């Protein structure tokens, strides 16, 4: 019977707690250590239901109750009520529906969901945590048919009056299948602290799958040294469970976080061409990824066997996409399949060439769709049942959306000023550097790669410097460079040996004009020396002066853009955000309790990252995956990424101000709002990025100060120190001896490290990801793959003659073919899409309707952060309307919105999610 329906007389009766059932087990806890505190700040509370009565002692207890003026004794028992919010699947297949009905039936006969409250206190006599009796949640069977995505169930506890504050709740799911528990709220008249909130957001497995109970802690944060005595051992046990023992094959229902090398990108059992080196270890240093424990391949004991689509790859259960995200990603994946399937079928049944025959054929991808543009005969098309089905059911999916790069000026991509603008306001604005040494110099071994000096001379660029000498232009910070020479040169022989792939190692020099815009003034295209130590074959091209030089200049810019696309995807996007963040996420779950205040800070910035990285290993960066098949580097893609990690990646320089200073595009200046002065004043990525960087830094510093008043509290926090130590020594273990790792000794150190991590997960990733289709979906603007070197009369006279006869066709034949282009477009369209459940920077952090923390001061600090983010967005909007900022405002010029924090769902070319979620 419902407690809320009790009469006064019944409410005065003694309530006997239910006797423990066999098999529930006993929780043992360490006693309170002398001098330890339980908490310092006010808490956020919110009632969830009608008042729950306190149950008084019975008359037989000998306690007298009384009339007017008599002091009423404290009751022996109090009633507490829990409300559990369970999220249902929006779409259930027949099997799941049947399982749901079976669970409802099992619930009626006692195989139900059982709860137990655990107090923050220990019992003075037993020295064990105070616990409630076990109770079952109500109405599971009756609410099976309830409408809505969320269902609220209730449970009622009776506890001793001195039970204290519930600090944890244990859940045993005795149904046959898992359920997603969003939150629990416990309230009652006997709680001096008010309602207690538990933000769960977790899958609770059946005890058949996982015999142990799940434990959830309240939203009140505690440093390890301040953990209430009733929760100490439980806190340690939960972390031990999450770490696992490093053995065994992981099941999809597991919650274990552990490390492994990238030894699953290749598939040697499939053939020699699918062998890939292991990334991670002394030979090829690399960050670690989440361990799955799969058995080795048959032909290489060091390589892990693969899980191929559509089978899921392991991530800890709560890291998997939630249903809204999964639905959006599946929809995007479906679109990718459709876009890729059609060209594949056409390639197999048509005798026609599959180069684009003209720019209008590329345009038709957005107008008429794949089927119509290729002129495939109708009767032949109808002979393929699957295609006919697609035609009938998904006609709209056969047509690509028009990329933003074409929306305001269809021919902008042809101009030099747009080519240069994208170096500071495009999808990869993080490689431009100030030129400080002329000619540019390579850092590669000259005994192998020849003399280090660039082939670009002052003669090449003197006429483009507005009367300045090269030295004067460098002194005035007028010369900048995008240098991919060393990133590509060691791999070019292997790349160029692949049929249909050709690349140079490129350098591009830009001049900063009086208008504040850049213009390209020289492009160097280098190939490896024929023999070690010999001079490199190089071409230097400058702005064109006639028809032939104009086409050669266009081809040179295409090679630069292709280099840029590869470095963007392999280094800046994948390595510097996705891969390098994963060890910090793994270590956070392994070493910091859910009640740790720093875990609470980082939690929204870790959402979905392990899942998207696992999907990348399965389909994107694997042997013959999307990256290898669509980008020029092909099979050496992983090695290019690893070379940057070994030679250039430094965590201490990954924060925005440090990165800008490292590249020479900014100098320290305490008089400036963000502490740096930009040498390219109209640098949209840096301008907007500094707004968000400063907002993040202020928020993190305020939050850290709430919990760490001095260096001692940082140094004595064993969970915090364990997280950072393992992130370096295991997760980034190949670079653990590097001298540049920041210390973690003071609150300032901690705030700096956390600011960098939040920046990388949110703004930096957004700037590099969500413009991929809007800015790269028109392949001639940023060809991911090039199939021809520049024509050379001495190397191939016939090819040069063909170029002169039809330069338009030569250019298009150098671009990706129809299959490569459409496959690439489909993938980056998916990667550029915001899901409906995206959580954006500065938005509310409450989880399932439950406050993310019970600390009012932390909530207030986050409110100030949200206001800072809103102001940043308003500033970005004003900048995009400022005609003085020519890199983001003007005739046909796209606004720079990649760091505008908010966004609707879909491909929007804006929006800063909290985490690396796609």
Swiss-Prot record:
Which parts of the sequence belong to the PLAT domain?
A: 90-218
* Pfam families xrefs: Lipoxygenase, PLAT
**Cofactor: binding details:** Binds 1 Fe cation per subunit. Iron is tightly bound.
Q: Which positions does UniProt annotate for Fe cation binding?
A: 573, 578, 765, 769, 918
Q: Which residues cross the membrane?
A: none
Q: Which CDD domains match?
A: PLAT_LH2
Q: What is its EC number?
A: 1.13.11.12
If you read the UniProt record, what top EC class would you report for this enzyme, in one word?
oxidoreductase
Annotated region (Disordered) at 56-76
- Keywords in alphabetical order, please: Dioxygenase, Fatty acid biosynthesis, Fatty acid metabolism, Iron, Lipid biosynthesis, Lipid metabolism, Metal-binding, Oxidoreductase, Oxylipin biosynthesis
List, in alphabetical order, the GO biological process terms annotated in this UniProt record.
fatty acid biosynthetic process; lipid oxidation; oxylipin biosynthetic process
Reactions mediated catalytically: (9Z,12Z)-octadecadienoate + O2 = (13S)-hydroperoxy-(9Z,11E)-octadecadienoate; (9Z,12Z,15Z)-octadecatrienoate + O2 = (13S)-hydroperoxy-(9Z,11E,15Z)-octadecatrienoate
Identify the residues that the record assigns to the Lipoxygenase domain, covering every copy.
221-918
Q: Which InterPro entries match?
A: LipOase, LipOase_C, LipOase_C_sf, LipOase_CS, LipOase_Fe_BS, LipOase_plant, Lipoxy_PLAT/LH2, Lipoxygenase_dom_3
Q: Which GO terms describe its molecular function?
A: linoleate 13S-lipoxygenase activity; metal ion binding; oxidoreductase activity, acting on single donors with incorporation of molecular oxygen, incorporation of two atoms of oxygen
Write out the similarity annotation.
Belongs to the lipoxygenase family.
* Stated name of the protein: Probable lipoxygenase 6
